[in-house]
Amino acid sequence: MTLNGWMQIALYGAVVLALVRPLGGYMTRVFNGERTLLSPALAPIERGLYRISGIDARQEQTWLAYAGAMILFNVAGFVLLYALLRLQALLPFNPADQAAVAPDLAFNTATSFVTNTNWQSYGGETTLSYLSQMLGLTHQNFVSAASGMAVAVALIRGFARASTKTLGSFWVDMTRATLYVLLPLSTVLALFYVSQGMPQTLSPYVEATTLEGAKQTIAVGPVASQVAIKMLGTNGGGFFNANAAHPFENPTALSNFLQMLSIFVIGAALTNVFGRMVGDERQGWAILAAMGLLFLAGVTVTYWAEANAHGVLSNLGLTGGNMEGKEVRFGIAASALFAVITTAASCGAVNAMHDSFTALGGLIPLLNMQLGEVIIGGVGAGLYGMLVFVVVAIFVAGLMVGRTPEYLGKKIEAREVKMAMLGILCLPLMMLGFTAIATVVPAGLAGPANAGPHGFSEILYAYTSAAANNGSAFGGLTANTLFYNTTLAIGMLVGRFFVKIPVLAIAGSLAAKKRLPASAGTFPTHGGLFVGLLVGVVLIIGGLTFFPALALGPVVEHFAGAAGQTFATGG
């Protein structure tokens, strides 16, 4: 570990914190329907979209209607994307003559992008046309992110409102998230990435001749526009197979820093939106503090594990840290930081190969996802995921002191706790259930490229990533098979919608309740004690659930490596 590496981490944290309040204030005005700096230009477009769609922006929805609209929209998006992938060979903007995507891969890919997972069992430059990348994937990058933001805002309204049955309008919230937040920021970022050397063209792939006289095909395309929203919307799916490790997808150290920043900025700022809308910004800062503590711990362990030679590397006499699978233009510090950011934020983009990390270095990204993607998390999804843990933490605190649990003046009762636990428990069911199946059936065992505990980790990582809607992978797993495409897609669907629907049910229940005045016995939820309790609940409920599985994978691999034991390649 070096001073330069710690300075990069400190600078990143400082810039994120500096942007929380201004962006949080802006988004609060957007979702409250107030005038913003962009209103003169965008308000007429917003009203025009409502007229075309037949939407009454003043008509609000109950939680059930809100959930129904959300599901209907996502089903329509899935059908259209699946059709586009299956028909891409017949459609324009296909200069590389890409064939139609196979049915199981199209099912997996459509599910992946609709759920904001962006798991990729394919290489983008060898599988998809420009039209599929733009109209299919980039479009879903916008609307899947906006859908998550809308659900988060609905949950915030559940805490902020009292004695009402409505949570706002899904159509209005999603439109405003896209039009006022995602599109403007993505446009600025895309232009910046082009200035750094990122391609943005509809021209065919470039045919080049190498110095040895060999012919080479250089893949290009509308890269910058997709990368901008893939990071900002915590989608993560790469235009190229190597994702952000590819020089065309992440050309410079500055583009790398901006990509890391854009992954966290909206999720962090939404905690401030929460504080503002419930009338106490300290509540948002407390939640952000809990997220920050978990994030800092993860960065520290990952950076230490990758920067220090140990285990097999130490036995080989290597002292420069683990550079395998990392880009020299980024180095160990930026690669470790990126890995923790992308798995904490449900993004899934990578600038280094996680499969090549040390056992402990790979454990932290895995654990980040298993905690439920609540360390900043996906845009919207991170906040509502952490608020689910807040409900459980407040319930536990109430049990300890023998009082009816309250949060922000709302009683936390059986219905809220049941819905919270449903949202929490569906993730380990998918992650561990499918991992168990894959380790005993031939189709599952054919996937990992490594034997021993690392092969198990490759399977566990895949299902963890899918259910957590992250999308990153241990690249040694051959996932483009009928078995993995199908089971991973099921994990993505359950991990997305079996969390969002209980969250909206909690929001509807809370919005209907009366607000109780604070009393001497009210547990303060803006101080260090609450932050510690929340972190403890996340680690106990989210972390201990997976300890046996982690012990069979990265933990065993770490101790085996320390003893100099390696495992042969092969499933």
Swiss-Prot record:
Membrane-protein topology: Multi-pass membrane protein
GO terms of molecular function: P-type potassium transmembrane transporter activity; potassium ion binding
Compartment annotation: Cell inner membrane
Keyword presence, Iron-sulfur: no
Classification via Pfam families: KdpA
InterPro entries in the cross-refs: KdpA (IPR004623)
Keywords annotated in UniProt: Cell inner membrane, Cell membrane, Ion transport, Membrane, Potassium, Potassium transport, Transmembrane, Transmembrane helix, Transport
TM regions (residue ranges): 5-25, 64-84, 136-156, 179-199, 220-240, 254-274, 285-305, 330-350, 375-395, 421-441, 488-508, 527-547
GO annotation, cellular component aspect: plasma membrane
Origin: domain of life: Bacteria
Annotated family: Belongs to the KdpA family.
Subunit structure: The system is composed of three essential subunits: KdpA, KdpB and KdpC.
Functional note: Part of the high-affinity ATP-driven potassium transport (or Kdp) system, which catalyzes the hydrolysis of ATP coupled with the electrogenic transport of potassium into the cytoplasm. This subunit binds the periplasmic potassium ions and delivers the ions to the membrane domain of KdpB through an intramembrane tunnel.
HAMAP family, sorted: KdpA (MF_00275)
Protein name: Potassium-transporting ATPase potassium-binding subunit
Protein species of origin: Methylorubrum extorquens (strain CM4 / NCIMB 13688) (Methylobacterium extorquens)
